[in-house]
Amino acid sequence: MARDFPLERVRNIGIAAHIDAGKTTTTERILFYSGVVHKIGEVHDGAAVTDWMAQERERGITITAAAISTSWQDHRINIIDTPGHVDFTIEVERSMRVLDGVIAVFCAVGGVQPQSETVWRQADRYSVPRMVFVNKMDRTGADFLKVHGQIKDRLKANAVPIQLPIGAEGELSGIIDLVANKAYIYKNDLGTDIEEADVPADMADEVAEWRNTLMETVAETDEALIEKFLESGELSVDDLKKGIREGVLKHGLVPMLCGSAFKNKGVQLVLDAVIDYLPAPVDVPPIQGVLPDGSEAVRPSDDSAPFSALAFKVMADPYGKLTFVRMYSGILEKGSYVLNSTKGEKERISRLVVLKADDREEVDALRAGDLGAVLGLKNTTTGDTLCTQDDPIVLETLFIPEPVISVAVEPKTKGDMEKLSKALVALAEEDPTFRVNTDSETGQTVIAGMGELHLEILVDRMLREFKVEANIGAPQVSYRETIRGSAGGEGKFSRQTGGKGQYGHVVIEMEPGEPGSGFEFVNKIVGGVVPKEYIKPAEQGMKETCESGVIAGYPLIDVKCTLVHGSYHDVDSSEMAFKIAGSMAFKDGVKKCNPVLLEPMMKVEVEAPEDFLGSIIGDLSSRRGQVEGQSVEDGTSKISAKVPLAEMFGYATELRSMTQGRGIFSMEFDNYAEVPRNVAEAIISKNQGNS
């Protein structure tokens, strides 16, 4: 079966931004103008096509990355609409991993906001080419050029306008295309009657100036264009388009467009720009992976190459488990068997679908460059590689952030117990930032996630989708332990009970590890003082103790343990004895290494009328916050601060009452920092049951 669209005419793009910048509305308009839907769905009415979970429609926010296929000007466009709330950052992360290009949506009033920076960093991490759509140009206070300045200053991007708005706020009537040097005037509310006209006389000077800036910026991307521009002082429309595309693909240029998705202005021009400037799968470097022998290899975006794909999302579905895949090379056919090379297991492909939000179309095959979903995979989870059994490869996987907040969940009845465990398994399969564990002392089930809203949504889904009745505990902070010093540790486990005894003895040296290294073990035993078969159990004992913590019961991070000495008994030594000795040595070492408690620090941004500035700063300081910056613009104050997560519970309510409901804030995880001694002592004491 031949391709519907050649690879050069395929675009895999994401729409990403800060919450409320208008991503989902932009996606809805794209679907309307490209003919996927025949009626416009509004987010605030709960009718958006890409917001199809009950919670999304109620809250007016996008939680999961919905994948949709559409077409425009004889091109296939696969779109992922990603959430803007930081609690769902994994959805953005996994989208970025499988996309070729991104439309970053900014609010013309709010400009560069905290989550915009997070999304931009995620796109940087995966080297995704991008363009900018400055949305909400119809809103009071909209300022396209102010946003341009913020993108250059705060995101350090070489942003260049390729459009200018005609009017702003309530007067937005059209858009100037600086490339074609034409004006597009919107004649009806639906945005379907557009008149092409000359640039308005009162904007001629401004347009000439910005068009010249565009030509200069584009000329710098290519030596041949520089020569042309210096000779004639002009670049043709084709030269400009070619230069902008080259600049975008090389990450040297970010074209900026403008409009109002809600008022149906500018969206068709965004679609044109996606085709003109964002890459096809063949324009981006081939995906890299590792072969079974450990050597690196690439898979070109080509149907004739060996099949390889990355599972980037798993979702429970009424018809079975849906696994979303990005096809990188080769062809995947219905009914075939493939290898999950990450887990070393064979999987059968029972059905293949492409999606239009909660609508689906069955297909016989997926090809290189496609985004689609597979039904029937048993053991594949997010980040796994699927490939041909004859030519195995493991592709680069996803970066998965650690959860920072947890709550205890208790089923109300025995019947709910079974439903709860099924629900937790299904939800954890879908969302790698959602962790489930059992508290060894209390036996309670504890769930952890990226923030209060994240856990709230998951608990809500347990009730709705899995009909689990459960009591939910108060949120708890995910603290960590670490060490600041170096020392030796010794563990000797010796027990005689008449008959065969138990004996294990290890000596270790302990020191702080590299940041992000977790637990690192080095074996420096010489001369067989500890036999080979007991090294692994000793390491396991240390690792398990590391995971359960020493001073307050929280996982210990960034520690290096070197096994240097020990002793054994021919008869009494066993794996269990050395595992216990390893654990004892680890605890002994930690206590001598200046152990400290770490807590998650959040990057907090608050916006409120200027009158409340003093109260907000005072309140943040009382929460152990450090104010890092403040500004006042048009009567609105913006404060950025770093505050411990432990001090931020209930902040939304407090801010509302402090600002008479006129303050808003956003918060995202920044780093782990040492807890002040007096606060740490209280936490340790409470966890040891002394409070």
UniProtKB/Swiss-Prot annotation:
<keyword id="KW-0648">Protein biosynthesis</keyword>
<dbReference type="GO" id="GO:0005737">
    <property type="term" value="C:cytoplasm"/>
</dbReference>
<dbReference type="InterPro" id="IPR014721">
    <property type="entry name" value="Ribsml_uS5_D2-typ_fold_subgr"/>
</dbReference>
<dbReference type="GO" id="GO:0003746">
    <property type="term" value="F:translation elongation factor activity"/>
</dbReference>
<dbReference type="InterPro" id="IPR035649">
    <property type="entry name" value="EFG_V"/>
</dbReference>
<dbReference type="InterPro" id="IPR000640">
    <property type="entry name" value="EFG_V-like"/>
</dbReference>
<keyword id="KW-0547">Nucleotide-binding</keyword>
<dbReference type="GO" id="GO:0003924">
    <property type="term" value="F:GTPase activity"/>
</dbReference>
<feature type="binding site">
    <location>
        <begin position="135"/>
        <end position="138"/>
    </location>
    <ligand>
        <name>GTP</name>
    </ligand>
</feature>
<dbReference type="InterPro" id="IPR004540">
    <property type="entry name" value="Transl_elong_EFG/EF2"/>
</dbReference>
<dbReference type="InterPro" id="IPR035647">
    <property type="entry name" value="EFG_III/V"/>
</dbReference>
<dbReference type="Pfam" id="PF00009">
    <property type="entry name" value="GTP_EFTU"/>
</dbReference>
<comment type="similarity">
    <text>Belongs to the TRAFAC class translation factor GTPase superfamily. Classic translation factor GTPase family. EF-G/EF-2 subfamily.</text>
</comment>
<dbReference type="InterPro" id="IPR000795">
    <property type="entry name" value="T_Tr_GTP-bd_dom"/>
</dbReference>
<dbReference type="InterPro" id="IPR027417">
    <property type="entry name" value="P-loop_NTPase"/>
</dbReference>
<dbReference type="InterPro" id="IPR005517">
    <property type="entry name" value="Transl_elong_EFG/EF2_IV"/>
</dbReference>
<protein>
    <recommendedName>
        <fullName>Elongation factor G</fullName>
    </recommendedName>
</protein>
<dbReference type="GO" id="GO:0005525">
    <property type="term" value="F:GTP binding"/>
</dbReference>
<dbReference type="Pfam" id="PF14492">
    <property type="entry name" value="EFG_III"/>
</dbReference>
<feature type="domain" description="tr-type G">
    <location>
        <begin position="8"/>
        <end position="282"/>
    </location>
</feature>
<dbReference type="Pfam" id="PF03764">
    <property type="entry name" value="EFG_IV"/>
</dbReference>
<dbReference type="InterPro" id="IPR009022">
    <property type="entry name" value="EFG_III"/>
</dbReference>
<dbReference type="InterPro" id="IPR047872">
    <property type="entry name" value="EFG_IV"/>
</dbReference>
<dbReference type="InterPro" id="IPR004161">
    <property type="entry name" value="EFTu-like_2"/>
</dbReference>
<keyword id="KW-0251">Elongation factor</keyword>
<keyword id="KW-0963">Cytoplasm</keyword>
<dbReference type="Pfam" id="PF00679">
    <property type="entry name" value="EFG_C"/>
</dbReference>
<dbReference type="InterPro" id="IPR041095">
    <property type="entry name" value="EFG_II"/>
</dbReference>
<dbReference type="InterPro" id="IPR009000">
    <property type="entry name" value="Transl_B-barrel_sf"/>
</dbReference>
<feature type="binding site">
    <location>
        <begin position="81"/>
        <end position="85"/>
    </location>
    <ligand>
        <name>GTP</name>
    </ligand>
</feature>
<feature type="binding site">
    <location>
        <begin position="17"/>
        <end position="24"/>
    </location>
    <ligand>
        <name>GTP</name>
    </ligand>
</feature>
<comment type="function">
    <text>Catalyzes the GTP-dependent ribosomal translocation step during translation elongation. During this step, the ribosome changes from the pre-translocational (PRE) to the post-translocational (POST) state as the newly formed A-site-bound peptidyl-tRNA and P-site-bound deacylated tRNA move to the P and E sites, respectively. Catalyzes the coordinated movement of the two tRNA molecules, the mRNA and conformational changes in the ribosome.</text>
</comment>
<dbReference type="Pfam" id="PF03144">
    <property type="entry name" value="GTP_EFTU_D2"/>
</dbReference>
<dbReference type="InterPro" id="IPR005225">
    <property type="entry name" value="Small_GTP-bd"/>
</dbReference>
<dbReference type="InterPro" id="IPR031157">
    <property type="entry name" value="G_TR_CS"/>
</dbReference>
<keyword id="KW-0342">GTP-binding</keyword>
<dbReference type="InterPro" id="IPR020568">
    <property type="entry name" value="Ribosomal_Su5_D2-typ_SF"/>
</dbReference>
<dbReference type="GO" id="GO:0032790">
    <property type="term" value="P:ribosome disassembly"/>
</dbReference>
